[in-house]
């Protein structure tokens, strides 16, 4: 099945599970995820573990890690559980064709078996340093060959490093659309991160990306957005003025999906520290926040969770 048809099915699944009545409220003290709830100790390792995000049904936890057993660099791994109240099992490597010898990270599961992710593999036709790809699992649970989204100016991928894709389908709401949020940045040459959005065009492919100006601070590095399922709250990583450490998690909201976002505010010291908090992601109901913290007490980056 082609990319667009799969995304369409994913959109129906997400739209059917949209959140109602959740507001941006205070978070509890964040905890290292493998130390609570009977979760498997291997969710975090002495390696780099980050980019955590749940599947819409809450039964799979996707992460990026450079732990032993991967294909090279950062790989995408997934832990599963039998119910939303059960502990997470040990993460398993997704293998090829998703993972490669290059960095493969920022997984974003959608619907029933769809997955956006970033790859820095230098394949023919690559747009830039890290591009957004989409893949899906077939009925046998096998991942299809990933498809790269179009290069700029026709599509969202650019010569820079795209990160943190976040798929939002609010097309059933007034002024609602099907959108893919993400960030662009570069370490060398140094280009500070900015948040962008690309609209899926009339059932066709994702179109040109535009900067979400109200979420961006020209003097800061704003990266890795994640939008709540109802499209009314977004979390992101930033080092803007007011940050407690190298990177903090910030949040913005809006009353309606067609409105501009509010000015981002720091989520506070229950979550943010003097370390770097990155790639935040909200659960489907908006009641849980996952993120990476670097350095962690165990590895160069560890996965944390908080609730509200």
Positions of PLM-derived features:
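Bacterial N-terminal signal peptides
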Residues: 5-16
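Short, conserved micro-motifs composed of acidic
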Residues: 20-308
């Amino acid at each position: 099945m082609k990319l667009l048809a799969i995304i369409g099915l994913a959109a129906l699944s997400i739209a059917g599970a949209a959140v109602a009545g959740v507001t941006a409220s205070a978070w509890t003290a964040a905890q290292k995820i493998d130390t609570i709830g009977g979760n498997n100790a291997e969710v975090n390792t002495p390696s780099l573990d980050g980019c955590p995000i749940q599947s819409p049904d809450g039964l799979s936890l996707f992460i990026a890690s450079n732990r032993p057993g991967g294909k090279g660099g950062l790989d995408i791994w997934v832990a599963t559980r039998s119910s939303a109240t059960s502990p997470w099992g040990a993460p398993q490597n997704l293998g090829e064709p998703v993972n490669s010898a290059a960095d493969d990270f920022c997984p974003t599961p959608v619907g029933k078996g769809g997955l956006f992710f970033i790859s820095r593999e230098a394949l023919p036709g690559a747009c830039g340093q890290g591009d957004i790809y989409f893949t899906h699992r077939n009925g046998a649970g096998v991942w299809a060959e990933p498809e790269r989204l179009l290069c700029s100016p026709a599509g969202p991928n650019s010569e820079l490093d795209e990160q943190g894709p976040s798929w939002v389908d609010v097309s059933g709401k007034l002024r609602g659309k099907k959108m893919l949020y993400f960030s662009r940045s570069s370490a060398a040459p140094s280009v500070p991160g900015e948040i962008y959005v690309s609209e899926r065009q009339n059932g066709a492919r994702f179109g040109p990306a535009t900067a979400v100006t109200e979420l961006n601070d020209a003097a800061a590095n704003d990266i890795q957005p994640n939008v709540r399922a109802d499209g009314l709250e977004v979390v992101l990583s930033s080092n803007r003025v007011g940050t407690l450490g190298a990177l903090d998690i910030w949040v913005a909201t809006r009353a309606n999906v067609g409105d501009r976002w509010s000015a981002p505010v720091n989520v506070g010291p229950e979550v943010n520290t003097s370390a770097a908090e990155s790639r935040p992601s909200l659960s489907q109901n908006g009641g849980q926040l996952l993120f990476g913290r670097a350095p962690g007490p165990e590895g160069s980056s560890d996965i944390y969770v908080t609730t509200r």
